[in-house]
Amino acid sequence: MELLRQGEHLHSTSRSTLESKCRKYKLIMQNDGNLVLYIGSLKSQSDEYCLWSSASCGKGHGPYRLSMQEDGNLVIYDSRNSAIWASGTMGHGVRGHYSMKLRSSGQIVVYDKYKQILYSSKPCTRDHLLSLPCAKPSGHPQSAYPPQQPGYGYPAQPGYPPQPGYPPQHGYPPQHGYPQQPGYY
């Protein structure tokens, strides 16, 4: 199944998943409350890598469910019916027949009834693939993101490490992605 229609759910207890049409990407509502997009085979954990996470691991009380609501919002609820993550698409677009699709590009997309995109994660490209294993469905879960990062889009790309012998610059802020040398702004 690659589509979650309005009124449908993914449950953390049922091991239900969404799988892209090409069978390359899997979206899993995990027992720890984390909604995670994986690339690779679920048959072999060594071939499975995390691409995106809702960063809702450990929030609320399990079991959890992902719901495509009638108002257009994609929401993760805990067992006490408290929302622990949402796409923020409530009331957007043309009302009725909302759906969430896992595209063959590795994108999670929420549509209205006229296929207008209300929410989208970034497409998965070779440049963005992570080589770090992430929360395994059958293992001990870890968060897919460090605590300071948001639970949508791709994790921040690592920057250059500080260069030895170069003190931090004062004055103009450094350009992201480029190491700064003393006296250069």
UniProtKB/Swiss-Prot annotation:
GO terms for biological process: actin filament bundle assembly; defense response to bacterium; hyperosmotic response; phagocytosis; response to bacterium; response to cAMP; response to cycloheximide; response to other organism. GO terms for cellular component: cell-cell junction; cytoskeleton; endosome; Golgi apparatus; Golgi membrane; Golgi-associated vesicle membrane; lipid droplet; phagocytic vesicle. SMART domains: B_lectin. Residues 153-182 are annotated as: 5 X 6 AA tandem repeats of G-Y-P-X-Q-[PH]. Sequence repeats lie at residues 153-158, 159-164, 165-170, 171-176, 177-182. Its main location: Golgi. Residues 138-185 are annotated as: Disordered. Keywords: Actin-binding, Cytoplasm, Cytoskeleton, Golgi apparatus, Lectin, Membrane, Repeat. It is a peripheral membrane protein. It comes from the Eukaryota. Residues 141-157, 172-185 have a biased composition (Low complexity). The keyword Cytoplasm applies. SUPFAM superfamilies: alpha-D-mannose-specific plant lectins (SSF51110). It is found in: Golgi apparatus membrane; Endomembrane system; Cytoplasm, Cytoskeleton. Residues 158-171 have a biased composition (Pro residues). The N-terminus is blocked. GO terms for molecular function: actin filament binding; actin monomer binding; D-mannose binding; identical protein binding. InterPro entries: Bulb-type_lectin_dom, Bulb-type_lectin_dom_sf. Residues 1-123 form the Bulb-type lectin domain. Homodimer in solution. May have a role in cell motility. It has high affinity for both G-actin and F-actin. Binds to vesicle membranes via mannose residues and, by way of its interaction with actin, links these membranes to the cytoskeleton. This is Comitin. It comes from Dictyostelium discoideum (Social amoeba). The lineage of its organism: Eukaryota, Amoebozoa, Evosea, Eumycetozoa, Dictyostelia.
